[in-house]
Every structure is written in C-alpha cells, then in structure tokens.
Swiss-Prot record:
GO BP terms: rRNA base methylation
Name of the protein this chain belongs to: Uncharacterized RNA methyltransferase OB0768
NCBIfam families reported for this sequence: rumA (TIGR00479)
InterPro entries: MeTrfase_TrmA_AS, NA-bd_OB-fold, SAM-dependent_MTases_sf, TRAM_dom, U5_MeTrfase_fam
Top EC category: transferase
Segments forming domain TRAM: 7-65
Residue numbers binding S-adenosyl-L-methionine: 288, 317, 338, 386
Length: 459
C-alpha cells in the first residue's frame, strides 16, 4: 500500500485560519485535513506561517505575520521569550478554557471516563508574580556578568532578564542588585563549554507570607572571593534576607545544585505558610512554587479525602510532608512515604514545628513499603498520592489496589498520566467520583488536578 504524502513541504508559506489549540497551547490549522501546529496563534485568528517541520500525520509551523487577531489576544507583559510562559499572549479566560478542555479530553480519550464530573477549573484572582523560587543561569558577555533564563531549546542566556512577571516581586528586586554586585566585585561567571569560571547559578527563594528571602550562590569550587562584602551589601539592601548559602557543584552537568551546601550567613532555612501550617524551606526542599494555589489544591484534596477522627491515612510521595500535615489535622494517624531521605528529614522537622505527633514518615519506595505495612496489619482508610509528572508506577498502583482503602485522592501535575492511572484503578475495583482542575501555573500550559476515587461496593 502506497504511503500517503503530506500535502505540505518544509519552508512553504501559507495564510491559514486557525480553529483550535493543542494541549501545549499551539494554534491548530488544517491544510487539506493535515494539522499544522503553530505557537503563539489563537483560534479564530488568521496568520501567515512558514512550515518548519513535516511529520507523517501533522506538522509544525512558525508565525510570520498575524492578518486577523482574536479578541482573546493580549499584549505579552514579557518580550524575552525564554519559553517558560507559553500562554502569555492569551487572555486568562482562554487559558483556563484550554486547560479545562485538556482535562476533559484525556478523561474521555485516555481514561474512558467521559461521564465523570470535571468541575470548572479553579483559577487565580491575580495570575501574576506567583512563583516563590527562581534558579537562574549566570554567564559572561563582553567581560560582564550576565544573568537570565536560557532561550527556548538552547543554552544561550537571554541577557540580564532581571524581572519576570510570574516571579515574586521580591525576586525581581534581588536579582538585578545581585548581578550588579557580581560585576562590582569581579566575580567570574562559569563557562559550561570550558568548565572554567566560578559562579554557575543564582537561586532565590521567598516566603510568600513571611517575606523571608534565601539567596543561594551555586559555584564551581568552594572559593568565593569578596563574599563578606557581598553579604554585607545584600543584607543592608534587603533586611528580609534571612539566609545566604553557597552550594558547590564541580561537575560537568545540567543539574543545578551540587552535593555540598554551606550556610554563609544567617539561618539554615527560611519559613513560609500554607493555611495555618508553617514549613521550613532549605535550598534543596521541594516546596510548591505557588503557595496561594497550593492552599486551594490542598483544601480540595482534604475535602475529597473526607477524613474523620478515626481514619488512618497513607500519603505516598509525601515530599517534605506538606500534604501529610494537612491530612493530620483531621486524621487519627498519617503515614508518609518518600524516596528522598533529605525530604523525610524536612518532613519530620515540619511536623515538629507544627506540633504534629500523629504523623510518621518513612524513607522508601511506596510500592515496596506498603505491602510490608499491609502484612503488619496496617489497613488505611484513605491513600493520598501526589506523584511526579510521569505518574504512578504500575507496581505502586497494584500495591494501592491490594490495600483496598475506602478512598483514594490522586493529586496530579499531568492530566495525561492521571487519566492513564485512573483507568488502571477503575479496572482494579475503584470508581472515579469527580475531578477538580486547579491552575497552579498561569501563563504556562501546565495544569494540576485532584481526583476522588472510592472503593466499589462489590470489593
């Protein structure tokens, strides 16, 4: 059978009317039924585009000129185009519609659960300046230290991108001042090609509610010339700085942080709150970057868990214990599991900070730990999972199914893997009751969800 040749060729130019959006936020137009995906174009817009890649079933294009614009188009607040904010040309209403549609679509096509209620997405009242953390590369140009995010799909630093409309405004003040200090005191930027130089990255973490600031300098060696003068100027300029840290990363790697961390000034941690709970945050802590929406997400997870005072709960992928402690406010006992030992140490400290003595944290892989707990007679009423983007391993899902909790609450940062895993849990004897999307990352194509499942009566 002859192969069907796509009706377009690379480098051809077309004027097209766009009709839809992909999950990534790319505009979709069709040429003789062949889909062409083009970034930064919206439905109902007409645009002149150049074909840049041709696959068998779809292609990609580049926007050359808009000839008709949508009422949903807005002027981007940032013109740097680092690739982090894929949707900043799109009205917030349309962003929410797109994300809602993505969740509906995977629930239908992947999970085959099109009858399950997907509630209207919970967006932000002020969808800007929400990120409480940045780790930004440092480079050199014409003998001057520069900082900025990498250009999309490259390691070229976009020079002196000191401000970002999704970063906490305190970060936007600290970064340019810090860059000026690096130049003032002659700090040499690291060059990843030659593996020479000193300063690799600058990380800034901010407590959204406490206003605490931590500054982390990631260096190639433990040497840090002029550090005392730099610290003096930083702490005088920003009294809310509570911690200045040096992290040493001597490897040729894209991983930002190395193994050795040393506090140069101040505290080991900064602190922030989610609801009534306080959390200690170290340079390496995984702490949700949008604490406002994290509270919304966790409140919904707690609602779906429907815990009473006699319930025993397992929190898999518990991290630094943030969800665990929310659950412990209602439950008789919470068991948290996490594979990263440092995260468990943070979790134990956070439990102590909040006076929680009904939480027990363990290091290990949940799929191996939970069967042992079951053998020891632990029968959880509720299991809460919050896995990485890849979703849950099949071994873990099978271990969870074998424990037969009354309810499962699945917190997800990837609707596609959520839908895949819901299908497995449905086939294992659980029923998906409802799904709640939450917009944790405005201006980006990411969407979080909380799903509630209950054990079917026949089980």
């Amino acid at each position: 059978m002859a192969k069907t040749k796509p009706p377009v060729n690379k480098n051809e130019i077309y004027t097209l009317t766009f009709e839809d959006l992909t999950h990534e936020g790319n505009g979709v137009a069709k040429i003789e039924g062949y889909p062409l995906f083009v970034p930064e174009v919206l439905p109902d817009e007409q645009a002149k585009v150049k074909v840049v890649k041709v696959n068998k079933n779809f292609g990609f294009g580049k926007l050359l000129e808009l000839t008709k614009t949508s009422s949903h188009r807005v002027e981007p607040t940032c013109h740097v185009h680092c690739g982090g904010c894929q949707l900043q040309h799109m009205s917030y209403d349309l962003q929410l519609q797109m994300k809602q549609g993505q969740v509906h679509n995977v629930m239908k096509k992947v999970a085959h659960l099109d009858q399950v209620p997907v509630h209207p997405i919970l967006g932000m009242e002020e969808p800007s300046h929400y990120r409480n953390k940045v780790q930004i590369p440092v480079g050199e140009k014409n003998g001057e230290v520069i900082v900025g995010f990498y250009q999309k799909r490259s390691h070229r630093i976009l020079q002196n991108q000191d401000t970002c409309h999704i970063q906490d405004e305190a970060i936007n003040e600290v970064l340019p001042f810090t860059r000026q200090l690096m130049n003032k005191y002659g700090i040499q930027a690291y060059d990843e090609k030659s593996h020479r130089g000193q300063l690799r990255h600058i990380m800034v973490r901010v407590g959204h509610y406490t206003k605490d600031i931590m500054i982390v300098f990631v260096t190639k060696t433990s040497k840090f010339p002029e550090k005392d003068r730099i610290i003096k100027e930083l702490t005088e300029q920003f009294p809310q700085v509570k911690s200045i840290v040096q992290n040493v990363n001597d490897q040729r790697t894209n991983v930002v942080l190395g193994k050795k961390t040393k506090v140069l000034w101040g505290e080991n941690y900064i602190y922030d709150k989610i609801g009534d709970l306080t959390f200690a945050i170290s340079p390496k802590s995984f702490f949700q970057v949008n604490p406002v929406q994290t509270k919304v997400l966790y409140d919904k997870a707690l609602e779906y868990a429907n815990i009473d005072k006699d319930d025993v709960v397992i929190d898999a992928y518990c991290g630094i214990g943030s969800i665990s402690l929310f659950l412990a406010q209602k439950a008789k006992k919470v068991y948290g599991i996490e594979v990263v030992p440092e995260a468990i140490e943070d979790a134990k400290m956070n439990a102590e900070i909040n006076g929680m003595n009904n939480v027990e944290f363990s290091v290990g892989q949940a799929e191996k730990v939970m069967p042992k707990w079951k053998e020891q007679g632990l029968d959880p009423d509720v299991i809460v999972v919050d896995p990485p983007r890849k979703g849950c391993d099949v071994d873990f899902l099978e271990a969870m199914i074998a424990m037969k909790p009354k309810r499962i609450v699945y917190v997800s940062c990837n609707p596609s893997t959520l839908a895949r895993d819901l299908r497995i849990l449905e086939d294992g004897g659980f029923e998906t009751k409802q799904v709640q999307p939450v917009d944790m990352f405005p201006s980006t194509n990411h969407v979080e969800c909380v799903a509630e499942l209950t054990l079917k009566l026949s089980n």
